[in-house]
Design a protein with these regions (language model features):
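Intrinsically disordered, low-complexity acidic/Ser/Thr/Pro-rich linker and tail segments
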Residues: 1-56, 64-67, 73-98, 159-221, ...
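A structural motif specific to WD40 beta-propellers
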Residues: 15, 53-56, 97, 103-106, ...
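WD40/WD-repeat beta-propeller blade N-cap
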Residues: 16-23, 59-65, 108-115, 150-157, ...
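Loop/turn segments within WD40 beta-propeller blades
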Residues: 26-33, 68-75, 112, 117-125, ...
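Conserved strand-to-loop turn within each blade of WD40 beta-propeller repeats
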Residues: 39-40, 80-83, 130-133, 203-207, ...
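WD40-repeat beta-propellers
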Residues: 44-48, 86-91, 136-140, 210-214, ...
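Blade-level signature of beta-propeller repeat domains, shared across WD40, Kelch, NHL, RCC1
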Residues: 708-739
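Extended acidic/polar alpha-helical scaffold segments
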Residues: 798-922
Length: 922
């Protein structure tokens, strides 16, 4: 049976994107803990912290951002870059925190070297900039001018902090205001001056110095560890500073592995250092000064008692190097600390309340939420759980990241710890010691297999309902990286215990393939194993690296794809080769068995293939091949990618008609099913193919680098692509919506065309012109105007012949005027239709002032440039027609002159008088 292509168009649209927001550098948060500002290379990104929604992405100036900050009131964003420029943006937040309008209000060059640190005071009016050459300036944010210049040291400024030493006294005085007489205006002014005189700026340097600048006196005061010997506060970078108005104490943290509390005594700052075993990157006061926190290279957030200077968090082991903390910021009034890690993850911690802070010890702090700033290079991804609400990502690291892809969105103001939104980080699967390269999942979505560069494969048990994410078994035996793993996907009977409780029934076996060219089959134990699981069967499979594995739907066969340009089909029970697929000219990167229930597929020769089924392969030769598993021959080759094909997946088959009356009708319905698959390549494109026609149905483009992985939602046909650009794109199948919209538009078009015919037939030119413009029918519009202009009985006072048409022309929108000018331009190029065009153009010029045409606002047009081109074309042809008419007039005088000359040469006229002919006098 010949395959006939359906007219339904296949379309996909971007439904969601998980994309990077932070790739190292500065992190800032407003006072309401709602707007997170992060550095993304040359760009600044603003994100709503509760919902994870990206509110704005601010383009850079071509150079990487050196530092940024946001004011506590979220009124301004300040961005400094390596180009030595500082840009100040005014922020306008929507009431529902759904978007932010960032307006550039000022660009300046603050220093001769890059600005490396910024600080804003609590009133959001003052900004301090610290440069790499040690220069410090204080700015008025709104005014954009420098208020103070600090003569700092000639070394890099590493920390800045505004504080007010009179804040505590002001609070106490405010409590007693009701019991005192009202101050006079002079007293209030004096009080304001007193408060202003207490503003200070503390700064730390790369060589361990701490200085305090008095904004009122414009003086700088040193802070020495030993005032007598003038030994500096620290021996290395001062990374963080904070001030407690309750204690009148300054806190500093340094990479010399110390943090110090400085108290004002006897006219000088005296410090009490607390030795630590890690470089300190961030410190601060919590709970009105009763607690201190510190964070550093160990990746731990520690709490300290301010009075005893002792750590109150229980002993904890240092975390991995990737989890070391490089910076932190705290909002004590929100009991929140946000830590930035080396792997570009933002970890959010809840700090103890005032009541809990009185305890002498507390359990180690763990983040209640993680935000992946970037997922780095995404090597593989799979859907998890029966409802496909989680996704596992292999992200060029030793940990597997689990993210939420559920449709649920948090409500405004929902600050529940761990509240899931789309793209929210749920958990990390830790266990591998090197980069995870491949993933696979069983039928239930609760069991995940992984292969890594540590030469092992692991099986993970995922149970988010009980917050359980554990490694079930470790499989060793390979001597090189495990680049491919596969699990059987046989669905057990619905009444079986394995179907009802999949968490208690792991898959039967696991297949792994490695760069050591071996494939191994491992029988999975029924109980969790602490040690390594031995290999059941092992075979030397290929001559080069094994790139991909796939198990057939019934579990009886599996396929291995290799860099040796071949794909081998194996018996799963015996690990014996049953067939070899040869034909690719380069290494094979991906392989995928057709799903169960696949209809017969038509090959290039026109022969329908069913039987044992078919299999897809994608290769470095830029082609995809469809193979017959009955005789292992190539049925069809698909060409279209411009680079390596790295992943192929079958799309879900459309459901056959349920109302088929007999088996023959059901078979016919199944035969008409559209068989499609998708591919992802190193050309950063996703292509959807028709398996029977061998043609591309559509091409999807939303990535900037090679795509390593592609998967499909088993129920909705949602495609998910990921690759080297750190972006995960979710493509929604909109074919049904597109078909419905096209059908509706076609039906509406037929109705409108019939209505237009009715208007023309009835002579309702007013309605006909409006509809013809709407439908963009230039031929019919010309016919209407021709009838109007050439009417035998033009109405008196009408510009074009009929006053109703004049009224229509005088009430056109900008888009309609522009469209009509386009049509007049085309008609004006033809001498036959030019008179009609000139008449209508004359009517338009009379009906509208000149500024109407010069200020046309048209969507889709290239602005004034496009309008100028149209008017210029009208002018050129109008001048040509005018010249032609002038020449015709001149030629008409020649005819008159000729006739006159002919009259002069004629004999005198003969006049008849009284019946006689008499010659007239000459």
């Amino acid at each position: 049976m010949a395959y006939r292509q359906t007219t339904t168009k296949t379309t996909f649209e971007v439904n969601n994107v998980i994309q990077p927001i932070f790739t190292g550098g500065s992190v800032a948060l407003d006072n309401g803990a709602r707007i997170l500002a992060t550095t993304l290379g040359e760009q600044a990104v603003l994100t709503e912290l509760n919902t994870g929604k990206q509110l704005a992405e601010i383009e850079g100036d071509g150079e990487p951002i050196s530092t940024l900050t946001i004011t506590p009131s979220a009124s301004h964003l300040i961005v400094c870059s390596r180009s030595l420029t500082m840009r100040i943006y005014s922020l306008k937040v929507s009431p529902d925190y759904d978007s932010i309008e960032a307006t550039l209000v000022r660009t300046t060059k603050p220093h001769a070297t890059p600005v490396v640190v910024l600080a804003v005071d609590r009133t959001s009016t003052l900004l301090a900039t610290g440069a790499a050459d040690g220069a410090i300036k204080i700015w008025d944010i709104v005014g954009g001018y420098v208020t103070h210049t600090v003569s700092g040291p000639s070394v890099l400024i590493s920390a800045l902090h505004f504080f007010e030493i009179a804040a505590l006294e002001d609070q106490a005085s405010n409590k007693n205001k009701k019991n005192r007489r009202k101050s006079t205006a002079e007293e209030e002014q004096a009080q304001d001056d007193s408060v202003a005189s207490k503003f200070r700026l503390a700064y730390g340097t790369q060589d361990g110095k701490i200085r305090i600048f008095d904004l009122s006196k414009r003086k700088t005061y040193p802070v020495y560890a030993d005032p007598t010997s003038r030994r500096e506060a620290h021996e290395s970078n001062v990374q963080s500073l904070d001030y407690s108005p309750e204690l009148h104490a300054l806190l500093s943290g340094s990479r010399d592995k110390t943090m110090t509390v400085w108290l004002w005594k006897e006219g000088t700052w005296r410090g009490t250092p607390m030795l630590r075993h890690e470089g300190v990157e961030a410190v601060g006061f919590l709970n009105n000064g009763s607690l201190m926190y510190s964070a550093g290279t160990s990746g731990l957030l520690r709490l300290w008692d301010t009075t005893t200077h002792q750590e109150i968090t229980a002993k904890q082991d240092a975390k991995s190097e990737a989890e070391s903390i490089v910076s932190a910021l705290a909002l004590p009034h929100k009991n929140l600390v946000v830590c930035a890690q080396s792997d570009f993850t933002l970890a959010l911690y809840r700090t103890p309340s005032v009541a809990d802070a009185t305890k002498k010890s507390t359990k180690p702090l763990e983040p209640f939420r993680r935000i992946s700033g970037t997922h780095d290079e995404i090597l593989d991804l799979v859907y998890l759980l029966p409802d496909q609400s989680l996704m596992a990502l292999a992200t060029n690291s030793e940990d597997i990241r689990l993210v939420s892809v559920a449709d649920k969105q948090p409500q405004l103001g929902d600050e529940e710890e761990g509240a899931a939104y789309f793209g929210h980080d749920v958990a990390l699967l830790k266990g591998h010691e090197d980069i995870v390269m491949s993933l696979d999942v069983d039928w239930s979505g609760h069991w995940v297999a992984s292969g890594a560069k540590d030469n092992t494969a692991r099986l993970w048990r995922v149970d988010p309902a009980n917050n359980s994410f554990e490694c079930y078994a470790v499989f060793t035996g390979h001597i090189e990286s495990v680049g491919a793993v596969a699990l059987p996907k046989i669905v057990p009977p619905e009444n079986s215990e394995a179907f009802k409780n999949p968490l208690d029934h792991p898959p039967a076996f696991l297949i792994s393939g490695s760069q050591d060219r071996f494939v191994q089959k491992r029988d999975i134990p029924r109980t969790s194993q602490k040690g390594a699981v031995s290999t059941s069967l092992r075979r030397l499979a290929h001559e080069k690296d094994i790139n991909a594995l796939d198990i057939s739907p019934n579990g009886k066969l599996f396929a291995s794809a290799s860099q040796d340009k071949t794909v081998k089909i194996w018996d799963s029970a015996t690990l014996e080769v049953v067939g070899i697929l040869k034909g690719h000219r380069r290494g094979v990167w991906t392989v995928r068995f057709a799903p169960q229930g696949m209809p017969a597929i038509q090959g290039e020769t026109g022969t329908a293939v069913s039987g044992k089924g078919v299999i897809l392969t994608g290769s470095g030769d830029k082609t995809i091949k469809l193979w017959n598993l009955s005789d292992y021959t190539c049925l069809r080759t698909f060409e279209g990618h411009s680079h390596n094909v790295l992943k192929v997946v079958w799309l879900r088959l459309p459901k056959a008609a349920d109302d088929a009356e007999d088996e023959a009708a059901a078979a016919a319905s199944k035969a008409k099913q559209r068989i499609q698959f998708a591919s992802a390549g190193a050309d950063s494109l996703v292509k959807v193919w028709d398996a029977n026609l061998g043609e591309t149905e559509c091409t999807l483009d939303n990535h900037e680098d090679r795509l390593w992985t592609l998967t499909v939602h088993p129920k909705t046909n949602m495609l998910v692509s990921g690759g080297s650009d750190s972006r995960v794109t979710f493509w929604k199948d909109t074919s049904a919506e597109t078909h419905a919209a096209a059908s509706s538009a076609a039906l509406k078009l037929v109705e409108q065309e019939q209505q237009l015919e009715n208007y023309i037939h009835a002579g309702a030119y007013r309605d006909a012109i409006i509809l013809a413009l709407q439908l963009n029918h230039p031929g019919r519009l010309l016919g209407i105007f021709t009838n109007v202009v050439t009417t035998n009985a033009p109405e008196e006072g009408s510009l074009c012949g009929i006053k109703a048409v004049d009224q229509v022309l005088g009430n056109l929108s900008d888009e309609q005027i522009f469209l009509l000018l386009l049509r007049l331009r085309d008609w004006n190029t033809n001498a036959r239709t030019a008179p009609v065009a000139q008449r209508i153009l004359w009517a338009l010029v009379r009906l509208y002032p000149a500024n109407k045409f010069s200020n046309l606002s048209v969507k889709g047009a290239r602005g004034q440039k496009s309008l100028k081109e149209v008017l210029n074309a009208l002018r050129v042809y109008t001048e040509r027609h005018y010249k032609r008419i002038e020449e015709l007039v001149d030629e008409s005088y020649l005819v008159e002159y000729t006739l006159q000359e002919m009259d002069s040469l004629a004999p005198p006229a003969i006049e008849e008088r009284d019946g006689d002919l008499v010659m007239a006098d000459a």
